[in-house]
Regions:
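Long, hydrophobic/aromatic-enriched structural stretches that serve as scaffold segments
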Residues: 1-10
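Internal, well-folded beta-alpha domain core
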Residues: 9-160, 167-169
Length: 169
């Protein structure tokens, strides 16, 4: 998809791939939480798919505790989670039980005289940010603000502490 086009995982160095393996997690409707090098079978199952089984009315309720616990375990060495997932997928995380600060970057493009979130570009920008954080081995929220790929620039004026905004003309 668009996020993975921005990530360009195939162009990362071996060191960058190792960093991604330690720090990047991918949310999946079928597998829950994945690392970049996990081997999976091809599938098409969106997190928002209406499917009920056992005591679960949907995939969100099925995965919520497991994904949250998995992330908490992986976040023991970090106090920050940079959320680059869509709203749909991140809804599978119980943020109230997450043991870290969540930073939700926002990407806006200039169109018709104003900045707005354009879904197609925002998806690709999330992948670009993941690539940037991996290539720069980001360790702090300040590292995030240096993101400048594909014409995006951090806007302190538009941002809040947990929702940095990146604008592109």
């Amino acid at each position: 998809g668009d996020v993975y086009q921005g990530l360009e995982f195939e162009k990362l160095s071996k060191k960058e791939i190792n960093f991604a393996q330690k720090h990047l997690r991918i949310l999946s409707g079928l597998y829950g939480v994945l690392k970049p090098l996990d081997i999976i079978s091809p599938y098409r199952l969106e997190m928002g798919t209406k499917i009920s089984f056992a005591k679960n009315k949907d995939l969100y309720s099925f995965w919520k505790d497991e994904i949250t616990n998995h992330l908490n375990k992986d976040l023991k060495s970090s106090s920050i989670l940079v959320n680059l997932a869509s709203v749909e997928y991140f809804s599978s995380v119980n943020t109230e039980k997450l043991n870290s600060r969540v930073i939700n970057p926002v990407f806006k493009d200039f169109k018709n005289g104003q900045y707005k979130i354009i879904s197609f570009y925002a998806k690709k920008a999330r992948g670009l940010m993941a690539k940037f954080l991996i290539e720069n081995r980001a360790r702090s929220s300040e590292d995030l603000y240096k993101f400048n790929l594909d014409g995006y620039k951090f806007s302190k004026k538009e941002s809040t502490e947990d929702s940095p905004v990146f604008l592109r003309k």
